[in-house]
Structures are given as C-alpha cells and as structure tokens.
Amino acid sequence: QDSASPIRNTHTGQVRGSLVHVEGTDAGVHTFLGIPFAKPPLGPLRFAPPEPAEAWSGVRDGTSLPAMCLQNLAIMDQDVLLLHFTPPSIPMSEDCLYLNIYSPAHAREGSDLPVMVWIHGGGLTMGMASMYDGSALAAFEDVVVVTIQYRLGVLGFFSTGDQHATGNHGYLDQVAALRWVQKNIAHFGGNPGRVTIFGESAGGTSVSSHVLSPMSQGLFHGAIMESLVALLPGLITSSSEVVSTVVANLSRCGQVDSETLVRCLRAKSEEEMLAITQVFMLIPGVVDGVFLPRHPEELLALADFQPVPSIIGINNDEYGWIIPKLLLAIDPQEERDRQAMREIMHQATKQLMLPPALGDLLMDEYMGSNEDPKHLMAQFQEMMADAMFVMPALRVAHLQRSHAPTYFYEFQHRPSFTKDLRPPHVRADHGDEVVFVFRSHLFGSKVPLTEEEELLSRRVMKYWANFARNRNPNGEGLAHWPLFDLDQRYLQLNMQPAVGQALKARRLQFWTHTLPQRVQELRGTEQKHTEL
C-alpha cells in the first residue's frame, strides 16, 4: 500500500508517517519524523546515560520535525552555512533524542533493504538530524535512511571523570539510536544485519569512534567517515578537567567535588545550560573506560577493535573557508606577512595541541622562505587542512586497511552554487560533498546543480549505497574504485573520477615521523631544563 499516511509498528508503539515524492524519480518515499529512541534526558537523566523510550498508546504523529538539541544558533548563521534561504523554524529543547526515517514507499517488513544511519556533524556542539533530508538517497538507491540526534555540547559531553558524570553521553545516545535501529528497522523494510553508519565532520569522528568502541560492536556492518576521524585533538581528550573546570566556573557552581557539581548543574534551567554550552565551539569526547576504553590512538595502534569495511575520505580544501571563519575567526582573504603569519601559527599550534616551539618547524615545512602573503596564507590553509583532516584520515586508513577492506577518496569538486558565496580560490571546502551525498543542501533545500553535478551526485549516491549493499562501492557504470592497500590507491571524486596514488605521501612522512620526533626532542629538552 503506497499509502499517503503509512502506519508502522515499533517496539514502543505505532507511528504515522507521510508520503513524499522526489524530483527525478517515480519512487515515493515514506518519511517518519521525530521517533523517540530514548527517554527524554531531563531532570535526574541530565548527564546520565540514555534510558529506553517509554511506550505510547494510539498512533504517534511522525509528520513533523523533532526539536533540535540545545546549541548556539548564532553559529548556524546563514552566511557561514551558505544558506540562500531561511531554514524551517525548528524548536530547540533538551528533550531531543529522536530520529527520522526515510524508507522507499514500496518497502515492507521482509524487504530487507540496506540501512544507512547518518550521524550529523557540527563539532559535537551543534547540528540536528533534520538538516539532512534522506529522501533522495532512499528513492534513488532503494535504501532505508535514518538520521539521528544526540545530546550536544556540555549536555552531551561534560564529564567529571568519575561515576557522577562519566561523559560521552552524546556518544551513548548514538549507541542507543543504533540499538533502536537493530530492534525496529525491519518494520520499515530495513535489514538490521546490513547497517552502514555514515557521517561528516564531527559525525565522521563519531562513526570512527563507534568503529573503535566495544559498546557499538555488532550494531553496524560498514562505516563511512567523511572528512573527520577519531583523531582530531579538539574532539577527543584523555582528561575531562579542561571542560569541567570551565563549566564549574561558568555555572558559578564553583570548584566543588563532582557529586556537588553535578547536583548543582542538574538544578540549572534549560536557559542557564544553553548559556554555558554556547561558550564551546567544539567539545571533546573523553576516554571514559567504557565507550572508549583507551585513547583512539592506542586502540588503533594496538588493533584493539573489531574492524568493519570502511570508506574514509577528505575534501581537497578542508580549511578553505568555513573552518577558518568559524574556529580562528580569520578571513582567508586577508593577506599577512611572515610576522603576522608567525602569530597565527602560534595560535594554530595551540589549537592543535602541539608544543608552540613547533610553529617554526611547520613554517619551514609548509612555507619555506617564501615572503609572498598570498602564498603564505594558502600554505597555512594547507597545513591546517593536513593537520586537522587529511593526515588523521590517512593514518586511520593505514591502520584499518590491514584488518578490513578500506576505500579512500579525495573529493575535488567545487559546487557551482557557491561561486558567489565565497572567494574563487576555494576548492572543495569542508562539507561540500554532503550536497552530493544527499542531492540536496541543508534542510532538503534544492540548490541549482548543473547537469554534470546531477551526474556527480548520482555517482556519489551510487558508490555510497553500493557500499551499504555489498561492503564494496563498485558497480556497473561507475569508475573503478580500488581498495586502499599497500600501493595506497584512492579515488579522486570529481566530474571525471580517476584513481590516484599515495596521496600526500611525503607530508604523511613529515606528520607521522619527523614531527613526533621533534616533539620528543622538545619534551626531552624541557625535561632537562626542569631537572636543572
């Protein structure tokens, strides 16, 4: 029944969805929005692991978008997100543990379609499921798409480092959503034995963390990490102190023992919590001994995880525009001389949690003795892209490829609709591939794609969905995408996809050998000084 208001069962009750049509295909899609996968994390459940959702009677309405989790909406400012329209007004609430499902209208219990679960990005401090519309992917590729939400910022990642607030609650929310999918997705025509998790930016970090977490084992069977992995210093820390100290001060709860601090924070209103959480542009997950038994670096190095087939990739200009504007508040169009650059390098090494003395080594490596301000800025951007995105992604690919099939890509196409929205020298910026994965921009808005771009989007969707179906992105009518193995071949994703080899191999040497050696030496000298 290709019904206009489909009703499906879940283990907590029935839900009614709606029928949507996707331009360019006859396939209808059933959408079920705002299904609860956990109990609202309110009151005593603030800073606690998620609890199972409660049952409801009657049929729940699944036709409107769920509230987003608490976040700083000012950052989601339209300029930065390149929105040329006003996003739908979506309420914000601490009660935000909901997911959206997009399933082909013909899908029935027993259809056994592959399932793709999207984890949104946003530095673990912002974003929402509803920014991403899964209907095109569902319609064109005959897969069930699920987009999930998780607690953000302080509410999702504050930790006292002990049992009073263990931290990673946002990650535990994601695990709860994946468990919900295992239990219920068959009712929507999905196959719980064929689940791929995919995400971009902090969503990629999340996916990468699930690959490493013993808690998530068996909840998914393939992983796609777009632009970020579990190794970005700003998104993972071994110690909860930095965040908890800031929170203790901002909340005026003071430097008290953890039990008192958590009690004090639980008594704060939603508005007060929002004011505290808005301070963080990024917030790190923490090595909690449960979700992450050890630091991701160690888990990867020791191969102490259950590998799954993976696609890992980056864009060719990750630090082109949106990230420097958000994180360093610098305008990449401003030219700076070497001295000014040195200052910025100093700030940047701090952000990357590297010893400040390494700034000069990085300048030598990336800028040589060049004095041209344009060149200096471009090289600074390349260095930051390498440090935050490219090198971590390559390292994870190298560490995973010996355990499970791994495919690597570099996305190289600059979307035509951005040409008036940012400077001409920006290539494929952070987040640019997402438009092609979903064939729509944020909140499902149609952006004008050229015919070639439509084709590129169909290709990207096909690679991603083939991977969800067969753990291998290759298929008829697509340029061959080789495994990332000893010869380090990868796919250059653009209008004419081609195979590349050994992406940035020399730089990888620099980041994995030269730099750590220098860090050791510097720490050694510091050691000596302290001893003297």
Swiss-Prot record:
- The UniProt record lists the EC number as 3.1.1.84, 3.1.1.1
Q: Where is the active site?
A: 201 (acyl-ester intermediate), 318 (charge relay system), 430 (charge relay system)
Q: Which UniProt keywords apply?
A: Disulfide bond, Endoplasmic reticulum, Glycoprotein, Hydrolase, Lipid metabolism, Pyrrolidone carboxylic acid, Serine esterase
Q: Pfam families attached here?
A: COesterase
Q: One MF term in GO for this entry?
A: carboxylesterase activity
Locate the motif Prevents secretion from ER. 529-532
Example of a GO biological process term? lipid metabolic process
PROSITE patterns the record matches = CARBOXYLESTERASE_B_1, CARBOXYLESTERASE_B_2
> Disulfide bonds, which pairs?
69-96, 253-264
What GO terms fall under cellular component here? endoplasmic reticulum lumen
Top-rank taxon of the source lineage equals: Eukaryota
- PTM-bearing positions, type Pyrrolidone carboxylic acid: 1
Q: Where in the cell is it found?
A: Endoplasmic reticulum lumen
Task: State which residues carry a glycan (glycosylated).
Answer: 249
Q: Coiled-coil regions in this chain?
A: none
Reactions mediated catalytically: a carboxylic ester + H2O = an alcohol + a carboxylate + H(+); cocaine + H2O = ecgonine methyl ester + benzoate + H(+); 2-(5Z,8Z,11Z,14Z-eicosatetraenoyl)-glycerol + H2O = glycerol + (5Z,8Z,11Z,14Z)-eicosatetraenoate + H(+); prostaglandin E2 1-glyceryl ester + H2O = prostaglandin E2 + glycerol + H(+)
Assembly and partners are described as: Monomer.
Role summary: Involved in the detoxification of xenobiotics and in the activation of ester and amide prodrugs. Converts monoacylglycerides to free fatty acids and glycerol. Hydrolyzes of 2-arachidonoylglycerol and prostaglandins.
Family membership, please give it.
Answer: Belongs to the type-B carboxylesterase/lipase family.
Q: What is this protein called?
A: Cocaine esterase
